[in-house]
Amino acid sequence: MDIIIENRKVRFNYFIIQEFDAGIVLIGSEVKSLRQRKVSIAESYVTERNMELWLCNLHISEYTQANTKNHNPTRPRKLLLKKKQIYKISGNMKNDGFTVVPLFLYFNDKGIAKAKIVIVKGKKLHDKRETIKARDWNREKSRILRGG
């Protein structure tokens, strides 16, 4: 598994409820740009239309060697999942406080682009502070154990 890009803010801003692996419908120039890692996942999210899941605001830069028929960098991209998974995700999206965001994009062992999408619930400010305290304590603990 070759990770292309990870959205690190997801783990800090949200509680992760459940994870899913989804395929992404891409065109050729988008795959080439992904291989060059010219992608931004920070503002992206998942929406549901007609019982299909779409990845919105995923910015894949235009491929420089492509001809004039290049892709739109922020177009919505269809996610490929099993129907049972789509029903589960769309049901959770309708609940208050839950949202679906991509955690990271990767190429699997066969070289196919995939997205790890997660159902999340937003953290409050005090939860974020607890996360920072735990991270700082773990860092301090490892320094003490190393003898530094």
UniProtKB/Swiss-Prot annotation:
Cellular localization per UniProt: Cytoplasm
A GO term, aspect molecular function: RNA binding
InterPro entries: SmpB, SsrA-bd_prot, SsrA-bd_prot_CS
Residue spans crossing the bilayer: none
GO biological process terms on file: trans-translation
Matching CDD domains: SmpB (cd09294)
Domain of life assignment: Bacteria
Alphabetical list of PROSITE patterns matching this protein: SSRP
HAMAP family: SmpB (MF_00023)
Name of this protein: SsrA-binding protein
